[in-house]
């Protein structure tokens, strides 16, 4: 293996590690968003059940106790626009978003796995050549 080949492998290894860091950060963001969407979906489903008091998280670890008769929720539509939607449509939109982001998460996981495998291959070659 020529010096240039070794240099290319080292450069590829560095690029792969940078890509891995970026994809892992994106994976974390998507995972957090999925958790938030799932929490929102649970909230909409709770609103669909009748009666009873509920604790509602209002931020910074604070909760308020309340009784809700809401049949609509203010839902983000994108581009800064919001609309009041009935609970059924809000639930449908949340499910669609969860499906979309689940696919993105799966794709990220597949790409991360491929990059990890390639990095391991390069590392093995470099170690055989005595380069760490």
From Swiss-Prot:
Molecular chaperone capable of stabilizing a range of proteins. Seems to fulfill an ATP-independent, HSP70-like function in archaeal de novo protein folding. It comes from the Archaea. The keyword Chaperone applies. GO terms for cellular component: cytoplasm; prefoldin complex. GO terms for molecular function: unfolded protein binding. Heterohexamer of two alpha and four beta subunits. Belongs to the prefoldin subunit alpha family. It is found in: Cytoplasm. Keywords: Chaperone, Cytoplasm. InterPro entries: PFD_alpha_archaea (IPR011599), Prefoldin (IPR009053), Prefoldin_subunit_alpha (IPR004127). Gene3D superfamilies: 1.10.287.370. NCBIfam families: prefoldin subunit alpha (TIGR00293). CDD domains: Prefoldin_alpha_GimC. This is Prefoldin subunit alpha. GO terms for biological process: protein folding. Its main location: cytoplasm.
């Amino acid at each position: 293996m020529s010096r240039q080949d070794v240099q290319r492998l080292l450069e590829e290894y560095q690029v792969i590690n940078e890509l891995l860091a970026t994809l892992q950060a994106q994976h974390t963001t998507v995972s957090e968003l999925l958790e938030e969407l799932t929490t929102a979906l649970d909230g909409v489903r709770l609103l669909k059940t009748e009666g009873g008091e509920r604790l509602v998280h209002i931020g910074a670890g604070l909760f308020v106790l309340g009784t809700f008769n809401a049949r609509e929720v203010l839902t983000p539509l994108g581009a800064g626009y919001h609309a009041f939607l009935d609970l059924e449509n809000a639930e449908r939109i949340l499910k669609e978003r969860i499906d979309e982001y689940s696919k993105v998460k799966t794709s990220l996981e597949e790409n991360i796995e491929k990059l990890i495998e390639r990095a391991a291959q390069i590392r093995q070659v470099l170690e055989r050549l005595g380069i760490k």
